[in-house]
């Protein structure tokens, strides 16, 4: 079993600048097949070590390595040397704190660590020792800046400057901004009016449809879903017709199908052993 400890030796060929360049290249690489997990109460990308090794064998990395071997070390064709070089690169990323070894927790383990299990994202905690095994998990602690980040900064600064210079705007622009703000307030007021009307209709309908639940119409602004999903379905009775309830049923069906599939696999494995 390979482990990274204080006594591990990384080759001199992979320095800090090289580690940063490699991390930038592979940060969002498709070979990593990254997933989202909750690490220190934040959504973070995590991946398996074997996926990182595959990314090092990708065409993108090979092209960079051919042009700049001093920054992107060449991966040897020999299997043993290949493993050593991959380990060397990854150890340097760990030492630079660009990747952090983690352990993925199951529901019961979450409760033991005082964490609330999440249906959408698995919880991750720091692993005391980085085991460079194929299925060990790691999270990124490195997020290179993208062109979109720069565009957002420029956009925010431009908006602030435009608002500060509002008194200098031409009369036509100020009149236009006035009508735009009125339109925005109108839309907001419309949403509140629909929500109030929906509530009144629901309460009144409870008298007639008490057994099945009150009658409601779209949109459900308080549903945990997107804008379009809040209009689906257009109307219904009680909780069973709501978007969240139907989504819950789908999740339960998927879990049930997965359990049955696992049972069949277990039965087949036992049959093969016998």
Curated annotation (Swiss-Prot):
Chief location category: endoplasmic reticulum
Keyword Repeat attached: no
Any Pfam family: Sec62
GO molecular function (one): protein transmembrane transporter activity
Location in the cell: Endoplasmic reticulum membrane
Segments on the Lumenal side according to the record's topology features: 170-183
Name of the protein in its database record: Translocation protein SEC62
Organism, scientific name: Saccharomyces cerevisiae (strain ATCC 204508 / S288c)
